């Protein structure tokens, strides 16, 4: 593959931002959240999600739509490590973090990776066979192996699907990808 990860990331972000302007991500997110409902099920689970950027899938309504689950959000730590924390109310428990991305406040409770049942991984681009292009920090590539019992998946808009992503030895594949058309 001749395109670099940086070039692919830039192109994918441009497509996502253009699509979000034409059709707000909130409206498109509802379709993917409905598909995710089958994965979540009715039993109480620990679900790792993330606060969305404007062009990303908005998972915050899950807290209201499926309140039986315990939702945990990532906090970026030094050394490009992630720590997940329990969030009851995004309005109260999330604060602006690095690059103004909402992250859990200091008063939230740390949740060990082995307690996570479902880990929803963000990304810029994906292939149908599970290759993932993130934002370039490798945070999730380091964190996923620590989630020993989690069902790992990603949600993606059609604009995020690409034929190929250049892979490096540390890059992990996402075993399950949910799109509007899958």
Model-derived regions: residue spans:
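N-terminal active-site beta-alpha-beta segment that forms phosphate/nucleotide-binding
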Residues: 2-96, 100-114
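Surface-exposed, charge/polar-rich loops and edge strands
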Residues: 1-7, 14-18, 68, 114-119, ...
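Short polar/charged helix/loop
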Residues: 136
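Short beta-strand segments
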Residues: 50-52, 74, 121-122, 154-156
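Short secondary-structure transition/capping segments
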Residues: 94-98, 121-130
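Short capping loops/turns at secondary-structure boundaries
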Residues: 109, 132-133
């Amino acid at each position: 593959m001749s395109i670099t990860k940086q070039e692919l990331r830039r192109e994918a972000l441009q497509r996502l931002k253009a699509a979000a302007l034409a059709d707000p991500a909130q409206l498109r997110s509802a379709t993917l959240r409905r598909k995710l409902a089958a994965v979540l099920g009715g039993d109480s689970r620990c679900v790792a999600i993330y606060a969305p950027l404007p062009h990303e899938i908005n998972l915050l309504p899950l807290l209201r739509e499926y309140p039986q689950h315990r939702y945990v959000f990532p906090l970026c730590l030094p050394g490009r490590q992630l720590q997940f924390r329990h969030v009851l109310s995004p309005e109260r428990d999330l604060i602006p973090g690095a690059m103004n991305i909402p992250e859990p406040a200091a008063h939230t409770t740390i949740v060990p990776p082995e307690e996570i049942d479902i880990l929803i991984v963000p990304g810029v681009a994906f292939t149908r066979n599970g290759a993932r292009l993130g934002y370039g920090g490798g945070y999730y590539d380091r964190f996923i192996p620590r989630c020993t019992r989690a069902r790992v998946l990603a949600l993606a808009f059609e604009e995020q699907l690409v034929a190929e992503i250049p892979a490096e030895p540390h890059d992990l594949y996402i075993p399950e990808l949910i799109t509007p058309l899958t």
